[in-house]
């Protein structure tokens, strides 16, 4: 997903609802910032938030809040979810984050993902936005 992708943002609340309703569903988020520098800054900030154990709330805020995705607005949102922004900025400089994103790009290429959003359910790629009903149906069909 890309934090600035309108279709990703539209699918996010449905994805969160499905996640919250089923203990059997495991969601692995893969940041795939393809819509410019602001997308990359948001992805790096979200990944850096893992160091403060606040990835999930920050990820949800980035996906649902109406911000312009400038670094100042991302930092304001980070503060709102309880992140220490000085530490966040330090953690954003960690080269492991860029290595992680590089591996994600490689994985996307290998899987044939060339846009956002994309979902992989039980090993099958579903490109494009999915509604809650679509997600529930595909998960049920996979035995989940």
Predicted regions and their residues:
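Structural alpha/beta surface segment adjacent to cysteine/selenocysteine redox centers
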Residues: 1-79, 109-114
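C-terminal cap of thioredoxin/glutaredoxin-like
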Residues: 7, 13-16, 75-144
């Amino acid at each position: 997903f890309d934090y600035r992708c309108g279709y990703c943002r539209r699918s996010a609340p449905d994805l969160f609802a499905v996640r919250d309703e089923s203990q059997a569903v495991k969601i692995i988020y893969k940041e795939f910032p393809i819509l410019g520098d602001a997308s990359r800054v948001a992805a790096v900030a979200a990944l850096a938030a893992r160091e403060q154990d606040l990835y999930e709330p920050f990820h949800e805020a980035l996906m649902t809040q109406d911000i312009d995705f400038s670094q100042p607005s991302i930092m304001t949102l980070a503060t709102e979810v309880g992140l220490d922004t000085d530490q966040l900025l330090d953690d954003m400089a960690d080269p492991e984050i860029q290595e992680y994103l590089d591996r994600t790009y490689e994985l996307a290429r290998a899987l044939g993902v060339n846009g956002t959003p994309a979902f992989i359910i039980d090993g099958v790629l579903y490109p494009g936005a999915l509604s809650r009903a679509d997600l529930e149906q595909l998960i049920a069909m996979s035995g989940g």
